[in-house]
Amino acid sequence: TIIKNRKDDPFRNNMRAETWNGDPLQKFLDEKVGDANYDVGHVFHHTKQPNGNAGCIGCICEKGEKGRAFSAGDLSNSVEKDVFDIDFFCHELGHQMGANHVHNLNNENTGAQVEPGSGSTIMGYAGISGANNVQRRSDPYFNHVSVEQMMKHITAATCPVKAPIANSVPVIGELNDYTIPRSTAYHLVGTATDPDGDILYYMWEQHNSPQPGRITVTSDNFADNLTEGPMARSLRPSRSNERYIPRLSQILEGKLSERNPGPTSTWETVSSVKRTLKWAFVVMDKSLGRRDDRETDVSTGNTVYAGVKINVTNNAGPFEVTSQARKTYWFVGKTCTITWNVADTDKQEVNTQRVNILFALDGQTFTHTLAANIPNNGSYTFTATADLTTSNGRFMIRPVDNIYLAVNLGKIIVKTDGDIDGDGIVDSLDNCIETPNPDQADLDGDGIGDVCDEDIDGDGVNNATDNCARIPNTNQKDTDK
């Protein structure tokens, strides 16, 4: 309906946000359009003060309720219009279609609050939640929980005219539940096929909403010891069917847990307490907004998901590498030893008897198998081979039949033997490979030469701050100051 005369505009005098929707719009649509001629009603307002209200949740097709929503924003500004489209119109329309909020700013007792802080998907409050902002603006997609809520309302509605969709639904492969040790990273992987051969896009989204009347997961209490609620944010769909928790870049830095995050934080953490983490593997056969070059049709896309449970136990963990925590040299043809803390993962409940060790030549792509199906006993000795040669290696230990993992913290250089520092000591025997020290002095006997040892006396205090760097004095006692 186009209003051609200003005098006929029923909204011209409704300058307050609380009067933009509700009865004026409902009355206008029912009189001018007719109740039987529309399924949902929504009015747009051009204003410098963005706002919105759905007037209901799940009211499509509902007489006297379905036409009460408004979205307001600066429609003349291309940047703000994008915000209007996603953060306001799609958000309020989502409410009309039956979706609740997914953010955790307060406990709304809906079971849909599966994203920490402000959330980042359409039904969250990204960008308007202060310290609780996960990011500045919402991403242009609905959380799988929102999709499920909307589909339930749409399916139950009485007014839609249903049309067949030629596009077949993707088929998700078998997924398994796992028990993992506390304070340990893990890796989620799923598979799916499409009967039509469509390009598939994937997400892993957590599906833990706080219990009614209990906590909310805000920046103040987001931590690895949460006993309920989400511990990981939603990430945009991509062609990758896997997700590391936390993200691999954090794992490589040894930052497995996160507390009190802000807008530039990852909002991802491992769990240090016993709990069940529910995850959904979400598969879509259409990209967001821009079609892929291989997509030749513009038909309706499908979204499907399947759930898994990751049980975190207090009886094991943390599973972690205990060797190669700092820069290390491995020499081709020489023996090397890797060690790790089994941390009762070989016992019930985790029951990991055998592990694989994977090596990354580039420090992050773990495609080379260093050892396969070896005992989970905390140690492995092998001979370095030429195909491992690299200046930036790392390794990952993970069970043969589980999803948790651990990565060493230091860079590994693999090379043939030589004498890098020219001090007359071959590198494989030199206790300070990069700095000349022909005397091989090692005061604390830790295998690291004094000239490159950050703690010469081995008392746990760095040389730079140790008030007696060559004599162990852990308490740093200094009676005369």
Question: What kind of feature is each model-predicted range?
Answer:
Residues 1-282, 289-304:
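Extracellular (secreted or membrane-anchored) zinc-dependent metallopeptidases
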Residues 47-50, 100-102, 127-129, 209-210, ...:
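Acidic glycine-/aspartate-rich tracts in secreted/extracellular proteins
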Residues 121, 317-319, 365, 438, ...:
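Glycine-centered loop/turn positions within well-structured domains
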Residues 173-179, 322-329, 431-434, 467-470, ...:
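Short, solvent-exposed loop/edge segments of extracellular or virion-exposed proteins
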Residues 178-182, 186, 271, 324, ...:
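Hydrophobic beta-strand core residues of beta-sandwich domains
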Residues 196-199, 344, 350-352, 436, ...:
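Short proline/glycine-enriched turn/loop motifs at strand-loop junctions of beta-rich domains
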Residues 205-276, 282-417:
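Extended, solvent-exposed regions of the mature portions of secreted/cell-surface glycoproteins
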Residues 415-481:
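Extracellular calcium-associated, cysteine-rich motifs in secreted modular proteins
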